[in-house]
């Protein structure tokens, strides 16, 4: 949801990945985050238990923001580790919108958003629409400004709604694409190139058969 992403983008807009990034958080997240947790108390769980769990998660998330811890073997089967969080902060096409888990990666694996770090790919940290400013208010609000500018592109209220609450990158005219659309376009292009390559290979005359035909004609 782009409106929520506009608050969280502050955390991702740094082109560095270190412990400083861990405490780089948007002010507006306090508006929506409580809604993700209040139902736990409403179900009857003690508030103290929730606070302790959130504290443990925050500490784990803090120390994940480092590039100096290698892959951790077996525990990566179910725990969200440092290399996985590097993937989460990358703006490489193959890494975007991956590894959302706080401590466990079980749900990422279940819903297809888990991605292992490929050490042969150089990671580019940050976001595709950076604030390009050191002004704190620009950093905090630049994506909200982008949403407003996009909403003015169409008079259709459904389009306006999607610009605010649809996935980041959505556009009514195809001028920008979501990460899902980008991946689908890349995959379609790769498949097309593969088919063309196969057709070229199949239509290429066999050199041995060609030589035999030439010799037959000479004879």
Regions flagged by a language model, labelled:
Residues 121-219:
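Cytosolic-facing loops and C-terminal tails of multi-pass membrane proteins
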Residues 1-124:
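Membrane-embedded catalytic scaffold of the fatty acid hydroxylase/desaturase
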């Amino acid at each position: 949801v782009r409106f929520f992403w506009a608050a969280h983008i502050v955390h991702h807009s740094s082109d560095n990945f270190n412990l400083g990034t861990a405490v780089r958080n948007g002010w507006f997240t306090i508006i929506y985050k409580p809604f993700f947790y209040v139902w736990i108390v409403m179900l009857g769980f003690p508030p103290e238990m929730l606070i302790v769990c959130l504290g443990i998660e925050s500490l784990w998330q803090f120390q994940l923001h480092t590039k100096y811890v290698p892959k951790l073997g077996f525990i990566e089967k179910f725990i969200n580790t440092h290399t996985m969080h590097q993937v989460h902060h990358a703006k490489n096409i193959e890494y975007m919108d991956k590894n959302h888990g706080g401590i466990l990666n079980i749900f990422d694996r279940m819903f297809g958003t888990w991605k292992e770090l490929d050490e042969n790919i150089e990671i580019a940290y940050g976001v595709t629409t950076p604030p390009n400013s050191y002004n704190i208010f620009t950093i905090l609000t630049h994506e909200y400004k982008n949403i407003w500018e996009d909403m003015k592109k169409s008079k259709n209220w459904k389009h306006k709604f999607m610009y605010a609450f649809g996935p980041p990158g959505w556009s009514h005219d195809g001028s920008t694409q979501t990460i899902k659309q980008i991946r689908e376009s890349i995959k379609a292009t790769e498949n097309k190139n593969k088919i063309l390559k196969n057709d070229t290979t199949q239509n290429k005359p066999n050199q041995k058969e060609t030589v035999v035909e030439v010799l037959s004609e000479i004879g």
